[in-house]
Swiss-Prot record:
GO CC annotation terms, alphabetical: plasma membrane
One Pfam family cited in the UniProt record for this chain: FixS
Organism: Rhizobium meliloti (strain 1021) (Ensifer meliloti)
InterPro entries: Cyt_oxidase_maturation_cbb3
Keywords from the named record: Cell membrane, Membrane, Nitrogen fixation, Plasmid, Transmembrane, Transmembrane helix
Function (record text): The four proteins FixG, FixH, FixI, and FixS may participate in a membrane-bound complex coupling the FixI cation pump with a redox process catalyzed by FixG.
Subcellular location(s) of the protein: Cell membrane
Protein name (database record): Nitrogen fixation protein FixS
Highest taxon of the lineage: Bacteria
Name of the gene: fixS
Keyword Manganese among record annotations: no
């Protein structure tokens, strides 16, 4: 029972820290462009100004 006195506040503080990190990510715009990465991975990179390397 003595360990619960330490574990409960630690668990609550870690949960609060995770919530603060999530809210910071929302506020800083981390979730603004969800489709951009999926389109960039499909891009060939053959645009102007980019050099394409072939083997």
């Amino acid at each position: 029972m003595n360990t619960l006195i330490y574990l409960i506040p630690v668990a609550l503080s870690l949960g609060g820290l995770g919530l603060v990190a999530f809210l910071w990510a929302l506020k800083s715009g981390q979730y603004e462009d969800l489709d951009g990465a999926s389109w960039r991975i499909l891009d060939d990179g053959d645009g102007e100004g980019e050099s394409s390397q072939t083997l």
